[in-house]
Amino acid sequence: MRKNLTKLTRVKRETKMGRATRWFKGLFGIKPSSCSGTDSGTISNRLDRSLCDSYETIPPNISEKEAAWLRSFYAAGEEEKERRTHAIAVAAATAAAADAAVAAAKAAAAVVRLQGQGKSGPLGGGKSREHRAAMQIQCAFRGYLARKALRALRGVVKIQALVRGFLVRNQAAATLRSMEALVRAQKTVKIQRALRRNGNAAPARKSTERFSGSLENRNNGEETAKIVEVDTGTRPGTYRIRAPVLSGSDFLDNPFRRTLSSPLSGRVPPRLSMPKPEWEECSSKFPTAQSTPRFSGGSPARSVCCSGGGVEAEVDTEADANRFCFLSGEFNSGYMADTTSFRAKLRSHSAPRQRPESNASAGGWRRSIGGGGVRMQRQSCSGVREAVVGNIERRRMRW
């Protein structure tokens, strides 16, 4: 009896395993190999195809690069085959575990049913000894199958965990490599941008250093003596102010000196006096208190002549052109030179106004009629000298 039961269970198990295996083979497209019906042509084709089925059968008449490529190709193919066989084995184990679990569940249900029938059946007390023995054998065998199915399920779970961990680790490593490459690329781009910025800032720094050096040279070449003379020439309303501030070399080397033409230059051209080769003409747009309409009567235009020993400004006041060029090297004209605010600022820093109509208060002025107009001379020029010196000192402190 026991032998028959053992054989029966073995046959059932083999049939179930065979069905599961055949089902998986059909699922993955694995067909049994048949050698019948093969001719010589197909055999030769198979032999030709199987010449390079693995990296061990690579022909020696190919180059090293091709051999290396074939080795890598076959290695990748072998890895793919191993993965496929591993997946098939895992699937087969899972199917076997599922079959075992189903069998265990059926056995447990049968045991429960038999126990219930034995307790409540009419023949519960009159069962034979062989029947009870068969029930015990079935219970033991079903318990064994259930334990085996449980072990198979645990193994499947462990295999799945290993495979998933391997895949997750590979994905994490690939992500880290891509992030490192991205960080390196960003670092390279930042370094290139910083180098470009430093290269663009270098010329500006050099020009600033050149500008400061020229200012230092200009400040070192200044003189403190200021001479104010009263013009006693034949032309009326003419004043000459001589301020030896710069040397000729400093004035000519000044890169910020510009020659600006007066707005009235087309109508009244400026005069150019060149007693020395290094003198140059310079006309500007800076007004002073002496060039206002209240002080200036009607007179021709004005000009400034720059000499090697200083700066000589000859001002001819005129009602139409309220301009005065005082080029001492301490300032240069820019794009804000011809605005109202800049003119007011220069007027506030210039010498105090001297009104010709106040005879009692301006005791230092003397009127004389000669030539073709009224000529005013001042015996004492201390006020004008102090104003010019203060203006130059303020310009120097500003620079």
Curated annotation (Swiss-Prot):
GO terms for cellular component: nucleus; plasma membrane. A motif (Nuclear localization signal) lies at residues 1-8. One of its GO terms (molecular function) is calmodulin binding. InterPro entries: DUF4005, IQ_motif_EF-hand-BS, P-loop_NTPase. It is found in: Nucleus; Cell membrane. Residues 198-219, 262-302, 346-377 are annotated as: Disordered. Keywords: Calmodulin-binding, Cell membrane, Membrane, Nucleus, Repeat. Residues 130-158, 159-181 form the IQ domain. Residues 81-91, 99-110 are annotated as: Calmodulin-binding. Pfam families: DUF4005, IQ. Belongs to the IQD family. May be involved in cooperative interactions with calmodulins or calmodulin-like proteins. Recruits calmodulin proteins to microtubules, thus being a potential scaffold in cellular signaling and trafficking. May associate with nucleic acids and regulate gene expression at the transcriptional or post-transcriptional level. Binds to multiple calmodulin (CaM) in the presence of Ca(2+) and CaM-like proteins. PANTHER family: IQ-DOMAIN 5-RELATED, PROTEIN IQ-DOMAIN 25. This is Protein IQ-DOMAIN 25. It comes from Arabidopsis thaliana (Mouse-ear cress). The lineage of its organism: Eukaryota, Viridiplantae, Streptophyta, Embryophyta, Tracheophyta.
